[in-house]
Amino acid sequence: MTGRDSASSDITPEVLLRAYACGIFPMAESVDDPTLFWVEPERRGIIPLDGFKVASRLARTVRSDVFTVSVDRAFKQVIDGCAAPQPGREDTWINRRIRELYIGLYQLGHCHSVEVWQNDDLVGGLYGVNLGRAFFGESMFHRARDASKVALVHLVARLIEGGFVLLDTQFVTEHLRTFGATEVPRRRYRAMLDVAITGAADFARLPTEQPIAGTRALAIISGREGLGRG
């Protein structure tokens, strides 16, 4: 289900949060399209946090800490990276208004980024929205092999440790299926969302001011480490 809103200037970050709580999110046709449209898929993409899969080769990369991973250090750079053309993805749905809205959510503490660095270069990352115990993944990018995958691994470890119960990917791609992504019908998704937005999670339960070792992220995902999660 989609609906176009030509008066996108009337959409505020607060309106956006209410939309997420109802299971809908905005997109644009292209970077040059000034309007937004609302989307509520018939089948919703999610990654079950207790079923997240990390391939052995990727696990070796994560464990090696060849990249440095940070959180909320370069949000605007990440959203710009996601908006830039990628191999196999020449067009983007992130227009100027989308960028403004999500920067607004970031300033309100409801949007976060995970950055992946190689030396001092930003080579990958992702961003998304948090509401209650739900996290809505918006977009990711990479400029080095496996950089966005490493960002996703660190995100999932943070969500598990922080008490989140829903990771919404909106849609499912073959790439996301390798991590365990699946589709659920709209009615089931709404029930999951209602539970997830009730209560609170802590995105900063793991430290945000210093990098987390890859071995620790993998241990959290596998259930071998905890900080007293209830």
Curated annotation (Swiss-Prot):
Disulphide bond pairs: none
EC code: 2.3.2.6
Major place of residence: cytoplasm
Pfam families associated with the record: Leu_Phe_trans
InterPro entries: Acyl_CoA_acyltransferase, Leu/Phe-tRNA_Trfase, Leu/Phe-tRNA_Trfase_C, Leu/Phe-tRNA_Trfase_N
Alphabetical GO biological process terms: protein catabolic process
Record keyword Transferase present: yes
Catalysis: reaction(s): N-terminal L-lysyl-[protein] + L-leucyl-tRNA(Leu) = N-terminal L-leucyl-L-lysyl-[protein] + tRNA(Leu) + H(+); N-terminal L-arginyl-[protein] + L-leucyl-tRNA(Leu) = N-terminal L-leucyl-L-arginyl-[protein] + tRNA(Leu) + H(+); L-phenylalanyl-tRNA(Phe) + an N-terminal L-alpha-aminoacyl-[protein] = an N-terminal L-phenylalanyl-L-alpha-aminoacyl-[protein] + tRNA(Phe)
Keyword Glycosyltransferase attributed: no
MF GO annotations: leucyl-tRNA--protein transferase activity
Subcellular location: Cytoplasm
This protein's GO CC annotations: cytoplasm
UniProt-listed Gene3D superfamilies: Leucyl/phenylalanyl-tRNA-protein transferase, C-terminal domain (3.40.630.70), Leucyl/phenylalanyl-tRNA-protein transferase, N-terminal domain (3.30.70.3550)
Domain of life where this protein originates: Bacteria
Keywords assigned: Acyltransferase, Cytoplasm, Transferase
Role description: Functions in the N-end rule pathway of protein degradation where it conjugates Leu, Phe and, less efficiently, Met from aminoacyl-tRNAs to the N-termini of proteins containing an N-terminal arginine or lysine.
Family stated for the protein in its record: Belongs to the L/F-transferase family.
Alphabetized HAMAP family for the sequence: Leu_Phe_trans
Protein name: Leucyl/phenylalanyl-tRNA--protein transferase
Organism classification: Bacteria, Pseudomonadati, Pseudomonadota, Alphaproteobacteria, Hyphomicrobiales
